[in-house]
């Protein structure tokens, strides 16, 4: 049975990803791309659907004799996972990663730390989501002289066009469908295992050198993350009246930068704490002397001890509100950096696409039917990701995402899709897989049938992002501006059209306020391109359309009786997409109409935790019965709204709630089930992490 979603860690080589559980099992791995058919699919079924388990034997013992516990973390600013297993008094460290040096490989290294640990190793190779069991052959290695070399032995599994090669310091034996073994690791010993995918009409790839691959992969991740350095200190001013060089206009010190006279108190505080510690040691030494220790004790009587301890303790400065604020800021910066790394992990090096998630059919409601394939690329996700990569100086990734959008839209901008394949293909075929589903949640899908839906917000988001690129100095080329003009002309035909909203509901189509607002943003971007940047285009028509859509939204998308914006023209309900209205500049963050909309959201679609649902589904508007769970993306949009409209403390509180719901590695899925305290939905989700980055930026960190 699969682990809880929150127990999984992501490994990535920027072309595909794998999920490894806290129990040491890789239960999900698609090769060679994010959207390929799964090699390991136990996540959506059982062990016979494919997995790779590497863990202490005691951890899989139904009646363990010794206590087993784990500690895990990523190496700093990487996706190199390190898990320390403690088995009684003994321990081992398992290091796992996907090399960034080419190919499609998973590397797992077991290093003995203390004592002896017996490891259990099971390899169930599969193709086609567990349906195909490959023919596995063991090849005996030889050295340069032709003599047998057991260290070069390998297992090769093959079926049709697919093949896998497994190498290691100890190869598991067993029946054709599952290989298993045990081996003992002592302190100082190390075992390395690699699994590589390759096309069956090619030779197996060369062996991976563990130290070299580890060093290179770590350097690549850290080189990318080094572009983000949130902890830059303020430079010293030339005189006491001069403002720091990078202080914003108005002389405001950026949020999160601590400038306080209390910094001078730190040495005294530390000294006082040390004095208390020394007194404790003195008292302990005295007690040891009384019980026979040969350690000489300082001459401190009981009264003197208590007097000195009280004096020293009185000098200890309790953490201030500012201290707590800075601790929180440090957490937020760390969460933003991890989110940036998640974003990079989900951008395909091969195609430049951003995959929404590495998984399919993880249920938004456990046991329910809201199960979708997220191994696709949504235009809005790519557009919002470009804003992030551009802001953080990742020019290569910005160019990759930009070029992917242009290739995807070059087919026919007038028939824009919401969802595309990773190469920009339009594939609307959705099929059901013969898998049990995560905790029995059916159906299990391959493919996404919402691709042919028109979603006005996707068109608008793309044009807004290209406008941001222009503002940043990115020049238009022979393809980019003509495609944008085609999109703008197509948008003129979509004013007032019905759609199924950005939430892709299965209910009746309607005129969604958010979709129309994104058309407004598209026209506004087009007008600016001509008027402000001198590009050619029918600015007069686009300006007329922009103003007409704005009037329409303010008359039909705004409910005068409620005093707020509503989800659909003429409706009364609100949904989380309305939180994007100030993001695109249709209204100000603190516009009274927007504040009233926020209040309505709090009243109707908020969970007691402060997180919010996407919408109220009491009338089954999305085609399913019952309410889904609080939504990470929507909740983070609300947190940003709070911060930018002057409710910073509310924004921080909501951000804290969201971070508490992420897993121990800082990864988020689609939603969170508070009743069961479980992550739900596909994992990890790119747009959730993009939205978190926006919130931290709103705090000025």
Language-model features and meaning:
Residues 1-701:
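Acidic, mature catalytic/reactive cores of soluble proteins
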